[in-house]
Amino acid sequence: MTMPFIKKISIIFILFTITICSAETIGRVMKANGEVLIKPIGSGTYSVSVKLGQAISNGDAIRVGEASFAVVIFLDDKSVVKIKENTDFQFVETSNTRSLIIEQGTTLHNVNSKDRKKDYRVETPVSVASVKGTEFSAFHDAVAGVDKFVGKSGNFDVFNSISGMTVNVGAGQKAVSNAMGQLIPAPAEPGDYPEDPEGDSPEEEQEEQDQPE
């Protein structure tokens, strides 16, 4: 075989492997209300209307419309993300990292430290929140270039991608990060933590999931 032929075969194999990995089912939609759409990996549009039990594949993006919400559970560690109205983001996983790439909107996270084998991150154009086992919310205003992260339990780090600053956020604390490079920690105030779209606490939901059938 000639070297160009071998190189061509190698490239095809790598692209095939990436495609297979990207198509891996990483989560499922537990609940959905209103307009909830999926943009499958490789697609340019939000073309799939979500149904209960809908598979979420690595690389998929989700859009939750006005007066709508969705709840997604990750299959490996049973971590849960609740997605509030007017939110868009993409699920991206590697062998050691789980990232939610937020374009806009508000998400509530209950990250299960038990059985978790990957780093859990929430990324916006401005900030990166690196999470261990904790419960927190993330809000990104795409127009203003402002993020707000609020801790409810546990702790996590927030990194401002512009300035390189990092702060640790614990329970009852928040961090406001913006496109000017500012990263401001402060005590959380009443109303900072978004209302749960289901009206249930993530702790109660996690306990229900852990109960044997």
Give the role of each language-model region.
Residues 23-213:
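Flexible, surface-exposed loop/linker segments and immediately adjacent secondary-structure boundaries
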Residues 13-14, 138:
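A periodicity- and composition-biased signal for non-globular, repetitive helical segments
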Residues 1-10:
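Bacterial N-terminal signal peptides that target proteins for export
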Residues 15-22:
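Hydrophobic h-region of N-terminal signal peptides that target proteins for export
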